[in-house]
A protein has these predicted regions:
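Low-complexity, acidic/polar, glycine-enriched regions of mature
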Residues: 4-183
């Protein structure tokens, strides 16, 4: 997956040349090479695992300050949940026709030795704050990340007609892993 780069508009004709601005930080941009974005939810008494493909991430991270930003776009059409994929993509759950993407925009910071990406997760047209704790290992120009967070599907109106946890549980565990290269 390719990260989005900066778009620089050239100065208008006959304008004085622009001077280069000093970089805002030492944050490096990272290109995601491989990754998985999965989720687990209980349906009746069984765990159901699903995943999203085709997602993209724009990541800037400064190793010296252990801070950064991340923007993730997730196409709901890339969701697979086994035999229940059509139902999960339908109006009762993700309503892919009306809400074709989910997004996460986060700020990365370290607190008490734990890296966390914090910001709004938008699913099904509803934004709610989440904090995704993650482990990060950087070797040379390669970063490996692994994180997990649990959300409540009701917060996002997913399966709103399933008000009883015995059919579809309220908690949904989200797991993300990725390998990225420094640009």
């Amino acid at each position: 997956m390719v990260l989005a780069g900066l778009l620089i508009t050239p100065p208008p004709r006959n304008a004085a040349p622009a001077t280069a601005a000093a970089p805002a930080s030492a944050a490096a941009n990272w290109t995601v090479e491989t990754g998985t974005l999965g989720f687990t939810v209980k349906q009746m008494t069984a765990e159901v695992k699903g995943q999203f493909t085709g997602w993209t991430a724009t990541i800037a991270y400064d190793e010296s300050t252990r801070t950064g930003t991340v923007d993730v776009t997730i196409p709901i059409a890339g969701m697979t949940v086994g035999s229940v994929t059509p139902q999960a993509a339908g109006p009762e759950f993700f309503d892919m026709a009306k809400f074709p993407t989910a997004t996460f925009t986060g700020t990365i910071a370290e607190t008490n030795g734990q890296l966390t990406a914090t910001g709004p997760l938008t699913i099904h047209g509803t934004a709610a704050p989440i904090s995704l704790p993650f482990a990060l290992t950087i070797t040379g120009d390669t970063a490996q990340m692994k994180g997990q967070v649990t959300i409540d599907r009701r917060t996002f109106g997913i399966g709103a007609n399933y008000k009883d946890e015995t059919t579809v549980a309220f908690p949904v565990q989200i797991d993300v892993t990725l390998t990225a290269k420094r640009k």
